[in-house]
Structure formats: structure tokens, C-alpha cells
Curated annotation (Swiss-Prot):
This is Malate dehydrogenase. Homodimer. The gene is mdh. Its EC number is 1.1.1.37. One of its GO terms (cellular component) is cytoplasm. The lineage of its organism: Bacteria, Pseudomonadati, Pseudomonadota, Gammaproteobacteria, Enterobacterales.
Amino acid sequence: MKVAVLGAAGGIGQALALLLKTQLPSGSELSLYDIAPVTPGVAVDLSHIPTAVKIKGFSGEDATPALEGADVVLISAGVARKPGMDRSDLFNVNAGIVKNLVQQVAKTCPKACIGIITNPVNTTVAIAAEVLKKAGVYDKNKLFGVTTLDIIRSNTFVAELKGKQPGEVEVPVIGGHSGVTILPLLSQVPGVSFTEQEVADLTKRIQNAGTEVVEAKAGGGSATLSMGQAAARFGLSLVRALQGEQGVVECAYVEGDGQYARFFSQPLLLGKNGVEERKSIGTLSAFEKNALEGMLDTLKKDIALGEEFVNK
């Protein structure tokens, strides 16, 4: 199993690469790519960690050598948020980066599963889909927007509030991956109940958690370490499913049946071909139904922006 990380010299990429080097199954290959000249050195640094994961780093304009034979490609390349920016302000720079990298994936490893981490995910996934479609290699079961950070944050905040072990809590999060499009389904967390006020406050905190980190870092960056952990969790789940493990479920942002929007984050059963089954979002509370209806315009606009970027 070969995993490629594109954007591997950045804050998320390095954290992700470290976690994959220590946690991928023995015999896996890990390939790091970034435009930055430091990238082969990041791979050398990680190669000193004693795990049975082969690692190589590549830099420069051409990602092809890193992508050859990849089964999973995780893309975190792009610029990070600064205070006062929201994820959509990143669009102007990151759209071009994602388009270029996905074009290279389409040429070199068209059958790979692709996880898009680069923000704004609501839009960059639509860009990736249109690029793959133009190249004639789009498979909607193999393209994912990685929203796992919303899930791990929800798990952490709920566990803190309710005095639970964080490992015992699993909150499904649906919709998209910015602002109001992030909808944690708190009504579906087993064995925990919330007041209306708690639901409103928690939902808001989960939606704004990225900003909490950007502000706390005081201009020095955005959420890189928790995002690295979230991306590793998703990537490792995907690898396990591709290798035939049964019953692997993760939420991610994928093209579905279009009931809510063309792309939508929901629980997915993963398998040897990527998405095996898009699972139902279940029964929503009145608060959640309302929030779902309220986000769809924003989500659809974000998606249209990505489609237009490629097709203009």
C-alpha cells in the first residue's frame, strides 16, 4: 500500500507524515511531495524512525515521481489561514494549487483514492471532481473531502462538557467543512443528552473551532497538529478498508445522490473500492433540521464556485 502526501513540508503535511510513518501497516510505502526544497530532508528525518514503512521525499514543480503507484493521495498543499481570514479567503490561492496537483494525479495514478485537506474543502473538492472528470478518470467513490477534524473536535468538546473519556464519544458531523455548513448531530450521540442551550453553544464552538486556533496562534498559523491527526485517522481508515478490513466507517465530504447538495459530508462505509455505501444521516432533531436547511444555500454556492473555476 502506497500513500502519497502532497504538501508534505507544511505544518499539516509534516504532522501527517510523522503519524503515517509511525502508524501505517508494516510494508507500506510513504511518499512525500512539496514544492519546497526541504521535502527530501523531511523524508530523511522521518526515515530515522524505526518502523517498517519505506519513505521518500520529492520537491520541485513535478509531483509525478511521488505519485507513481500511489493507492491513496492526501493533499494538504496550500496557504494557511491568518487572523481575519475565513476559509473562503483562501480560495484565490488554493484553488489553483489543487487544480494543478489533481491534474498530475489524474495522469499518474488515476485509480488512487484522493483525500482533499486543502481549504476551502467545500470548494476544492468540487474543483478536484471537475478536473478528474475532464481527464475522464472521475470515480465519485474515490474522492473525499477530509472533514475528520470536525469529528475529532466534536468528540473532544462533548467529552469535556459531559465528563466522558474522549475515546468513548463519536459524534457524526454532516454538511460541509466551514462555518454554518458544519453540522454536528449531537442528538445522535448515544448515552448523552444536552439542553437546548448546550446544543446551540457546542454547535457554534465546533463551527468556529478553526478560528479559535487561528486567534490563539496570534498570526503564527492555523490548526496544523490537530488537522494532521485528523487526516492521519482518515488516511489510516482508508488504508485498512482498502486492505479488506470490514466495517470501517468515517464521515467525509463526497458526491452522493444530490439530495441535499452535489457534495455532502455524511457517514460512509469504506471498502476496497473507496466508498462502499453512503449511510443515512438518520433522524435529526428540530434544531438539526433547521440548521441543515439553513446551510444548503451556502454549501451549494461554495460548490458552484469550484465547478466554475475549472469550467470557466
